[in-house]
Amino acid sequence: MTPKIVCVAGPTACGKTTLGVLLARRFHGEVVSADSMQIYRGMTVGTAAPTEAEMQGVPHHMIAVAEPSEQWSAAEYVAKATPIVDDILSRGKLPILVGGTGLWMDALIRGHGFAGGHAGGEVRRELETRFDRDGIEPLLAELWQVDPESAARLHPADTKRILRALEVYLETGETISAHNAATRQLPPRYDAVWIGLQFADRADMKALIDRRVDKMAEEGLLEEVQALLAMGLPRNATAMQAIGYKEFLGVLDGTLTEQEALELVKLRSRQYAKRQLTWLRRNPAIHWIYWEKDRDFARALQISTEILTASGLG
């Protein structure tokens, strides 16, 4: 029988962390984070990583497990998180996946579907050298020759996925589109019960995101960016491109005032939340809970408990 896990998903600032903890306490679970930025050490403020108090004694996994200089893909996340989920299950506990990185959540549930090739290996370095020298156009033209399906799907600005598609083909002889099509037919590794959180009124979500960004500034986001630079983290590191960090680099460079940076972080956070919702709404398995003016966690816990109990958990 496919083991069951719970997924708590939603856009930034919607209360996933709190509901995940409440469900873990109710169902004897442990939280596994699925946030592509909370994996990094030294970035607790800008990623809104849960504090010890917010964890309420519930074990949390996959938070602050990587150096900010590292670059993780969904494949690396799955490789690290799967043994943790399996260990939680082996101890009779319920894994509760919490996060806003929908691709990583889907990938962990599938448990397969990653094309071969050694991401970051010699082939990737050669492709990156060519990209730095010649730009993306010749590489995209090459992708059209070997994998037209991927080339047609990818925007020229999506250089990361263009390089990855070429890397897979050059290392394995198989196109990434063919590989993905084949693996979509395979059964998932886990049977996921999805709980989704979002606001009924987008204006309420906007207000909450704005308050969260202000709180990050008060808690020392600028100082966190300075600390990362002081430890030698390059400005072009993936971690530094996260919302909040990139903008506050501008403050340190003198190209933005702190207030301008804050407004830009708020705008980009709202845009990111919209993209998160677009991704998640494609998933028909999600049981959505809609917040009204405020986030009523007692009500959300009650609804979630009913959903999980009906799914055979509890």
Regions inferred by a protein language model and the residue ranges of each:
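Phosphate/pyrophosphate-binding catalytic cores of soluble transferases and nucleic-acid-acting enzymes
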Residues: 1-314
